[in-house]
Each structure stands twice: as C-alpha cells, then as structure tokens.
C-alpha cells in the first residue's frame, strides 16, 4: 500500500516535470532519495523510466490529429505530417547513437544528487543568459513547417546533452531550438514530439535490461507501474496545456531561476 502511495507521488512529479524544462529524471532521482520504493534497485531504476509512458500517451492524445497523417483530408496535408515525422526521427538519431552505448555507464555513475544539482544550476544559468540575449530579437522559425531537416538535426544534437541527469530532455531541445531561432511555442511543441520516439526507445531499453537481468514482475509491481503511469498521464495533460499557454506570453527565465534555486538547495542539504 505504501508503495502505491509513493507511486502516486512519483507519478505526479513525472507528469509535472517531463515536459517542463526542469528535468523529470533529476526530480525523480531527488524524490527517490526521500521516498524510495520498497522494491529492488533494478525495479526502481526501470520504474523511473517506465512511468514516462503515461506522459508519452498524454502527448499522443493531445496531438493525435496533428500527428496522424491518415486523419488529414488532403494529400498535401498528409505529406506535411509525414515530413514532420521524418524531421522528428532525424532529430532523435543523435541521442540514439550516443545514448545507447552509454546507457549502463550512466545508470551506474551519473544518477547522483551532486550531478543533478550541478546540471540544474548550469542549465538554469544558460536559460537566463539565452533569454536575455534573445530579448530584442525576433524568431525566424515560427511554424513547425519552417523547421528544416538540418534544423531538426541541430536540435537533436542539443538533445544529446540530456543524457546527463538533471539536464532535462525538453530543456536541452528547447534551449537549442531557441538558440537556432525558433519561437518559444514551436520549440516547445517540437520538444513534445521528440519525446515520443525518444521515450519509447528508452522504455524498451529499460524494460529489456530489467528482464535480461532475470527479473520479473510481481502483482504489486504491476500495480505500482500502472499507478505511476496513469497518474503521470493525467498530470502531464494538465502540464502540457499549461506550458503551451505560458510560453505565448512569457519567456523561460522563471524555469531558469527555479533550476538554480533547486540545485542550490540540493547542494546545501548535501554539504551542510
């Protein structure tokens, strides 16, 4: 029963932070140091990523018509959707090439509070610096159709940075997209779309690794997984809608300050 309650809390954290540029993995790592599940470390490591499935479904639900080429009434519209998917896949490739070989090493060495705190602060500072730099500049990529294949690849290269816990997958891609000249709204949406193949790939790897190690799932573990995923799905829907409204009238500096504050608090707790 206590693990179900913990799964609800972790699911809320996942749903709130997955698409905000503040690092869901970093937050979940920190939460796990406070309310760790009463399960094996193998299960906990896998659980942290599997509950992202709920967040993926939230994007699929909210953008189903936009991302479904077969729902389009004309050949031109269908072709545009297929092109969008091609750009998303191109953007995902760098993370796949770099992340796959380093997956096990990162699990063993980088999921620590000091790594999370450091990356939270560093990228928080970068967001503030970038937003100040862009203050009087206009974006030249203002629609998803304006994103070229080359631009998609560049954004994907920035996503590689997110393999370090605390960086934030959405934060890295949004930061890169803004630097390239993408509007905040388009950068945010494209980040959502990149999450689908990226997180599905990570999900497959983590479950595969868990099973390869000879592990299985008990009834309680299935309940914990389902609870965390459902909660993250429901909360992510709210978070996505809120973020899309927020970026239409605000910049990302509040997230930068939040990252710096949280990272500083973690470091203070560690060393005091």
UniProtKB/Swiss-Prot annotation:
GO molecular-function terms, A-Z = undecaprenyl-diphosphatase activity
| Topology of the protein relative to the lipid bilayer | Multi-pass membrane protein
Per its UniProt record, what InterPro entries does this chain match? UppP
Q: What catalytic activity is recorded?
A: di-trans,octa-cis-undecaprenyl diphosphate + H2O = di-trans,octa-cis-undecaprenyl phosphate + phosphate + H(+)
Q: Indicate where this protein resides in the cell.
A: Cell membrane
By sequence similarity, the record places it as follows: Belongs to the UppP family.
Q: What else is known?
A: Bacitracin is thought to be involved in the inhibition of peptidoglycan synthesis by sequestering undecaprenyl diphosphate, thereby reducing the pool of lipid carrier available.
Instruction: Sum up the protein's function in the record's words.
Output: Catalyzes the dephosphorylation of undecaprenyl diphosphate (UPP). Confers resistance to bacitracin.
> What is this protein called in UniProt?
Undecaprenyl-diphosphatase
Top-down, what is the taxonomic lineage of the species of origin? Bacteria, Bacillati, Bacillota, Bacilli, Lactobacillales
Q: What is the primary gene name for this protein?
A: uppP
């Amino acid at each position: 029963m206590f693990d179900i309650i913990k799964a609800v809390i972790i699911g809320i954290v996942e749903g709130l932070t997955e698409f905000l540029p503040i690092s869901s993995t970093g937050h979940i790592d920190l939460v796990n140091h406070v309310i760790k599940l009463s399960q094996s470390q193998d299960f906990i490591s896998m659980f942290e990523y599997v509950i992202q499935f709920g967040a993926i479904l939230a994007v699929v639900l909210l953008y189903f018509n936009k991302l479904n080429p077969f729902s389009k009434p004309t050949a031109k519209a269908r072709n545009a959707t297929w092109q969008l998917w091609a750009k998303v896949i191109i953007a995902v490739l760098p993370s796949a090439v770099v992340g796959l070989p380093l997956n096990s090493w990162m699990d063993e060495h980088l999921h620590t509070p000091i790594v999370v705190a450091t990356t939270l602060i560093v990228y928080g500072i970068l967001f503030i610096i970038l937003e100040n730099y862009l203050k009087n500049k206009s974006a030249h990529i203002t629609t998803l159709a304006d994103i070229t294949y080359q631009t998609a690849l560049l954004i994907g290269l920035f996503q590689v940075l997110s393999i370090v816990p605390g960086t934030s997958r959405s934060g890295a891609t949004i930061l890169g997209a803004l630097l390239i000249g993408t509007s905040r709204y388009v950068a945010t949406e494209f980040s959502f779309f990149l999450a689908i193949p990226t997180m599905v790939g990570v999900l497959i790897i983590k479950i595969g690794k868990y099973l390869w190690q000879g592990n299985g799932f008990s009834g309680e573990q299935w309940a914990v997984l389902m609870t965390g995923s459902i909660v993250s799905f429901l909360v992510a829907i709210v978070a996505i809608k809120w973020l899309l409204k927020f970026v239409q009238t605000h910049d990302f500096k509040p997230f930068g300050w939040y990252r710096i504050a949280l990272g500083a608090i973690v470091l203070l707790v560690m060393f005091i």
